[in-house]
A protein has these predicted regions:
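Nucleotide-state-sensitive switch-loop elements of NTP-binding domains
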Residues: 176-179, 183, 192-240, 268-284
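Conserved catalytic/coupling modules of large nucleotide/cofactor-utilizing molecular machines
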Residues: 64, 240, 258, 265-484
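Phosphate-binding/switch loop-helix module in NTP-utilizing enzymes
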Residues: 225-263
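The Walker A (P-loop) glycine that initiates the GxxxxGKT/S ATP-binding motif of P-loop NTPases
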Residues: 152-153
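N-terminal accessory targeting/assembly segments
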Residues: 1-89, 94-98, 473-479, 484
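P-loop NTPase nucleotide-binding/switch module
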Residues: 69-71, 85, 98-146, 160-164, ...
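Conserved glycine(s) of the Walker
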Residues: 157
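Loop/turn-to-beta-strand initiation segments
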Residues: 182-185, 211-214, 246-250, 299-305
């Protein structure tokens, strides 16, 4: 029987979050974990400096770490607790509860830094996963096994939108079987505020949907290594639900940019020469390792929704650009839309999906989105004219077109369940079928006699808007704008 050798090292230097270890005998491999006998200190091997000398990230116990301290390793990497006992609980990357509850007894533990599934085992399910949020389901639908990114600067509503998606999916789908599979959700909070995690936890608990969600947090107060590994730990939990329990998993992460930022901080701490825009030279491989683990197999699926902070609203930032290649759909949150008071503040034309094909979303949905994007695109050209001479000076055809574009924009606003106590408006869930029917009615001119303001923060039009009369404007034929 193979027994793992105990590797011993001695701390020779401690600089902030970095500890240097010297070894007299056998040397460690990258990412091995070293601890003290009482496990008050936890170090992860990160970099080889010279023969027998290695730099380690201090994951735990920086206050008690000192020069001359001996640490040992059993040739193991960092593991996180996984399994059904994590559902309804909040943990850190060490599997310790941070929700004030009892200790978690997990049936298994798995390595945080795992490998992606073999490409022969990866399966692609071309099926839309409904969220009940009109603008997402219509313009950038989530597909089983797909990845969708919520891009936006500070304070435009990424976290609220992510929380609403989680609430709707859990309420509507989780805990119910589909093709003999149970659906669960995993939420990874990476580098964000503790308050946001606190609010999310109690919102889910209050609505009695926490039992189908596992949460792992590494808030901004933690060091860079812990924040970086929290994202990987979340994926490891999702993989276990997929591979061992045969579940369909919705994986949500807030925020992927903080994951990239944590990697950059780690690179700086280890004195690695940066690459473009000051980011770590390994950012490409780190993003690949993270995203390629989010996949579907014969056993189950992982679908991800990723909040992505855009620093200074610069979409060309290299940290943001490094995420793009792995996304199937992009939802762009706009500060201009936010200032206009339409929530969720999503740029309708700036959002896109590679899944927008008739074979995936259906002929009717494809027709509706093609017409809607055409109306929105053509109305952009009229906005400058309206700003100069006013809407009343437009031709009847252009006036009807501009009117319909405003209706579409207002219709895509929606009251959310997770902020009911703040807005005073009850949340609304709208099915995709209703959304498609409503948009077709709008672009076909059936609501031309109704003011656009009537469409703000409503659910389905058939329930909230008075019965339409025949349009008074001529039918407008618009040239279709290709859907990205």
């Amino acid at each position: 029987m193979n027994t793992k050798e105990t590797i011993k090292g001695k701390v020779t230097a401690v600089v902030g979050q970095i500890a240097e270890l010297r070894f007299e005998g056998a040397e460690p491999e990258l990412y091995w974990i070293f601890t003290t006998p009482d496990r008050s200190v936890l170090l992860q091997v990160f970099q080889s400096v010279e023969p027998k000398v290695y730099r380690c990230m201090v994951l735990k116990g920086r206050d008690v770490l000192c020069r001359g301290m001996e640490v040992t390793s059993n040739e193991e990497r960092l593991k996180v607790k996984v399994g059904k006992n994590l559902l309804g609980r909040v943990v850190d990357i060490f599997g310790m509860p941070v929700d004030g509850g009892s200790e978690i007894v997990a049936d298994q533990a798995t390595e945080v830094l795992g490998d992606s599934p073999h490409y022969k085992k990866v399966r692609s399910e071309k099926k839309v996963w409904e969220t009940g949020i009109k603008v997402i389901d219509f313009f950038s639908p989530l597909v089983w096994g797909g990845r969708i990114g919520l891009l936006g600067g500070a304070g435009v509503g990424k976290t609220v939108l992510l929380a609403e998606i989680l609430h709707n999916v859990v309420t509507t789908h989780d805990g119910h079987s589909d093709n003999n599979r149970r659906r669960v959700s995993v939420f990874a909070g990476v580098g964000e505020r503790v308050r946001e995690g606190h609010d999310l936890y109690y919102e889910l608990k209050e609505r009695e949907v926490l039992k189908d969600v596992a949460l792992v947090f590494g808030p901004m107060g933690e060091n860079a290594a812990v924040r970086f590994l929290t994202a990987m730990a979340g994926v490891a939990m999702a993989e276990r639900f997929r591979d061992w329990h045969g579940m369909d998993v919705l994986f949500l992460i807030d925020n992927v940019y903080r994951f990239a930022q944590a990697g950059s901080e780690m690179s700086t701490l280890t004195r690695t020469i940066p690459s473009e825009d000051g980011y770590q030279p390994t950012i490409g491989s780190e993003m690949a390792n993270f995203h390629e683990r989010i996949a579907s197999t014969d056993r189950g699926s992982i679908s991800s929704i990723e909040a992505i902070y855009v620093p200074s609203d610069d979409l060309l930032d290299y940290g943001v650009q490094s995420i793009y290649p792995y996304l199937d759909s992009i939802i762009a949150l706009s500060r201009d839309v936010y200032q206009e008071g339409r929530f969720p503040s999503i740029d309708l034309l700036g959002s896109s999906s590679s899944m927008m094909t008739p074979t995936v979303i259906g002929e009717k949905h494809y027709e509706a989105i093609t017409k809607a994007r055409s109306v929105l695109k053509l109305s952009e050209n009229l906005e400058r004219m309206v700003a100069l001479i006013g809407e009343s000076e437009l031709s009847p055809e252009n006036k009807a077109l501009y009117h319909r574009s405003k209706i579409i924009k207002n219709y895509m606003s929606q009251p959310f369940f997770v902020v009911e106590d703040q807005t005073g408006r009850p949340g609304v869930y709208v099915s995709l079928a209703d959304t498609v029917d409503d948009v077709l009615n709008i672009v076909n001119g059936k609501f031309d006699n109704i003011p656009p303001e009537e469409f703000l923060f409503v659910g389905s039009v058939k329930n909230k808007v008075p019965a339409p009369v025949e349009a008074t404007h001529e039918q407008i034929t618009t040239q279709a704008v290709p859907v990205n």
